Amino acid sequence: PAAGPGPYKLLPRLYFRSLVPQLHLKLHPEIAVETTYFDRHGTVSGGRIDLRPSLSLPFIKRYARIIPKLSLRHTEYFLKDEGAFNDRESRTVPVASLDARLFAERRLSLFGSTMLQTLEPRAYYLYIPKDGQDDIPIFDTGRFGTTFQSLFYENRFAGSDRVGDSNQLT
């Protein structure tokens, strides 16, 4: 059987992430920007710019960490197409999350040995509204595998072409 067109060439891929110094009220602004041009013969090619500004207000103590966060995910596409997509597509999706952890420790004597017992419960709430993304090509996006850590990811997709809707408490 004939091989498919193969993977996209990235010409180039630039990524920038900035943690802005703390503002008053302990707000933590952050911005991530990625720009990539995807090229593959015989199919849709084009550029993508992904902007992810966010603002969080961490509450961090020795016994707890609570981080509410608001983000905006804006992705813009500039396409050279074989007919399936418009020349220009975009998507803007708000993201809200609340990550809460408690840290409890106690000394424990067991069989003559002193140990430190630690309990770290965590609750994570994520809200992302449903957004139709059928008009956007998939250049480099796939689903993450299911792991314990993936329960706390902001997006169930790896890559910038899809943002998974969510209204869940983990």
Language model feature labels by segment:
Residues 1-170:
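Outer-membrane beta-barrel proteins and related beta-barrel translocases across Gram-negative bacteria
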